[in-house]
C-alpha cells in the first residue's frame, strides 16, 4: 500500500462520497457514471468508431476542452456493443460548446 501510516487510511477501507442534496434526484445517474469510470469504461464519443455515428464540430469546442473528444485508437477499446446514443457515458450535444449550439 502506498499510504505510509494506518492513521492516514480510510476507516474500514471505505471512502465516503457525499452527494449534495440539490443533486439527489440524480443520485442513480451519478452512481452509474462513477461505477463506469471505476470499471475503466470510456465515453461513447471517444470510441474508435465514433465517426460512424457522430459528427463533432471541433471548431465549436471550448478552448482547452478538446481532449473530451479525443478518439481512441482501435487497440485502446474493445467494442462489444454498438454505439449507444442513450448511454450515461456520452455528453449532451452541446457539452463544451463555445456558443451553446450543438456539437
From Swiss-Prot:
This is Astacin-like peptidase p16. Gene3D superfamilies: Collagenase (Catalytic Domain). Keywords: Hydrolase, Metal-binding, Metalloprotease, Protease, Zinc. Its EC number is 3.4.24.-. Its cofactor is Zn(2+). InterPro entries: MetalloPept_cat_dom_sf, Peptidase_M12A. It is an enzyme of class 3 (hydrolase).
Amino acid at each position: 500500500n502506498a499510504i505510509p501510516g494506518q492513521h492516514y487510511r480510510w476507516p474500514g477501507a471505505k471512502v465516503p462520497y457525499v452527494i449534495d442534496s440539490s443533486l439527489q434526484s440524480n443520485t442513480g445517474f451519478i452512481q452509474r457514471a462513477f461505477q463506469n469510470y471505476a470499471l475503466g469504461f470510456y465515453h461513447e464519443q471517444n470510441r474508435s468508431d465514433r465517426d460512424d455515428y457522430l459528427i463533432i464540430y471541433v471548431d465549436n469546442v471550448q478552448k482547452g476542452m478538446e481532449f473530451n473528444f479525443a478518439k481512441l485508437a482501435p487497440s485502446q477499446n474493445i467494442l462489444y456493443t454498438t454505439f449507444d446514443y442513450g448511454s450515461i457515458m456520452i455528453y449532451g450535444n452541446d457539452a463544451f460548446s463555445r456558443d451553446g449550439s450543438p456539437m
